Swiss-Prot record:
One of its GO terms (biological process) is aerobic respiration. NDH-1 can be composed of about 15 different subunits; different subcomplexes with different compositions have been identified which probably have different functions. NDH-1 shuttles electrons from an unknown electron donor, via FMN and iron-sulfur (Fe-S) centers, to quinones in the respiratory and/or the photosynthetic chain. The immediate electron acceptor for the enzyme in this species is believed to be plastoquinone. Couples the redox reaction to proton translocation, and thus conserves the redox energy in a proton gradient. Cyanobacterial NDH-1 also plays a role in inorganic carbon-concentration. GO terms for cellular component: plasma membrane-derived thylakoid membrane; respiratory chain complex I. This is NAD(P)H-quinone oxidoreductase subunit K. PANTHER family: NADH DEHYDROGENASE (PTHR11995), NADH DEHYDROGENASE [UBIQUINONE] IRON-SULFUR PROTEIN 7, MITOCHONDRIAL (PTHR11995:SF14). It is found in: Cellular thylakoid membrane. Binds 1 [4Fe-4S] cluster. Its cofactor is [4Fe-4S] cluster. Residues 221-238 have a biased composition (Basic and acidic residues). It comes from Prochlorococcus marinus (strain MIT 9301). Residues 213-244 are annotated as: Disordered. The gene is ndhK.
Amino acid sequence: MNPQLSPKAIREIREGTCNPLGAPQVTTDLSENIILTSLDDLHNWARLSSLWPLLYGTACCFIEFAALIGSRFDFDRFGLVPRSSPRQADLLIVAGTVTMKMAPALVRLYEQMPEPKYVIAMGACTITGGMFSADSTTAVRGVDKLIPVDLYLPGCPPRPEAIFDAVIKLRKKVGNESILERTKTEQTHRYITSDHEMNLVFSENTGEYLNKTSANSIPSSKKEKITELPDNNEKAEIIDTLEN
């Protein structure tokens, strides 16, 4: 090395040899306009800001949700856009009682929704069957027996403010998810509900139920066919016959 070079010149030569391109120079204006993020965060941010619900309202709970559409609550600020087709929705809001006849339709709508999809069970009737869970044979005692539920919203019915709180909690859940981890919707918890205790009812079209002995059945020997309206005496005889 040339001994006539100054120490500063020698230092510059060494830095140029080790790093010929030099350190990148980023201006202050450019550094303030750069956001570093991950693919998961970007994807979740886009999804939580544009939840498209499919409204499945069957009872009075849906009236409270309909109040959100007005200007007083304005659910558009959360990016909620109601859809009429399950193929365009990613959020299913079940509001009201689910009956046995409507259960297949609910499951079909859920299966037609694309992944990832979420479910909010709104109201006591949706979560446990509500007032119909005690003696009704047609009400489903908990919608989580049919489809997985992400968020339970109790109430009879829940207030619109409670619905907003449920949507905010769901947005937090969506924001913490990962694309690689969420491959399929899986329910991690269940609401404690009572099981169904139903007996098979024989077809009334064939009349087979008349041949089955039960506590409420009438013996065939005491059955009478009434073709015209009986008088008071005949009514008393028929009642005595049925009681005996």
